[in-house]
A protein has these predicted regions:
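Mixed-charge interfacial surface used for oligomerization/domain docking
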Residues: 17-27, 32-38, 44-54, 58-192
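Single conserved hydrophobic/aromatic residue that forms the stacking wall/gate
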Residues: 2-13
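Hydrophobic/aromatic beta-strand patches that form the interior of the parallel beta-sheet core
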Residues: 7-8, 38-40
Length: 193
């Protein structure tokens, strides 16, 4: 089929990614002519974008029209949730979300922030805990509390060189919820699809 469906990262990179996607769309059309191309705002990153790509493929495989794919995937994106725990607070300190003093104190106390994304893709702190094990348990509690229609959902977990933690989070969640399917993927450094 002569059509493409894509989008960059969430709101943090929205303008740059959107402009790059629009430029790519324009260049493609200049070279190959008019095609159906739609740019999604994934409001996610990493495994969230992987899930979106899987949903697009599922829609394509089922024979949906271009507009049906767009509508279905937009609805799918709106129902996605992203959660994560930070190993250290350097990123929050460097981007100004946490002062240097607070980062030092939190690090000394082994405080791990539990983070998530709002529906519009904005990252926010959902809670915190002392130690990684407690933080992961708190994250799992947030996931379970926020989850709607679990039997329709795919639980996708990404990790960066920490498969044991990913498996533990998967175990904690699958003991309490019944999802359509579940998988774990490894990422490396800054990760997008």
């Amino acid at each position: 089929r002569d059509r493409s469906v894509s989008r960059g990262l969430g709101d943090v990179y929205k303008r740059q990614s959107y402009n790059s996607a629009e430029l790519g769309k324009k260049l493609y059309k200049e070279e190959y002519g008019e095609k159906d191309i739609y740019i999604f705002n994934s409001r996610s990153a990493s495994v969230g974008e992987t899930l979106i790509a899987m949903k697009i493929q599922e829609c394509e495989d089922s024979g949906m029209s271009f507009q049906e794919v767009i509508d279905t995937v937009e609805q799918y994106i709106a129902g996605q949730n992203t959660y994560f725990v930070l190993e250290n607070l350097d990123t929050l300190r460097k981007n100004g979300r946490l002062t240097g003093i607070k980062a030092i104190v939190a690090s000394a106390l082994n405080i791990k922030p539990v983070m998530g994304a709002k529906p519009e893709g904005i990252i926010c702190q959902l809670g915190q805990a002392r130690g990684m094990k407690r933080a992961l348990a708190k994250m799992a509690d947030h996931i379970i509390e926020d989850l709607e229609n679990p039997k329709e959902k795919i639980l996708a977990i990404s990790h960066c060189n920490c498969e044991e933690r990913a498996l533990e989070v998967q175990r904690m969640l699958l003991e309490k919820i019944n999802v359509r399917s579940s998988f774990i993927i490894d990422t490396a450094g800054i990760s997008t699809m």
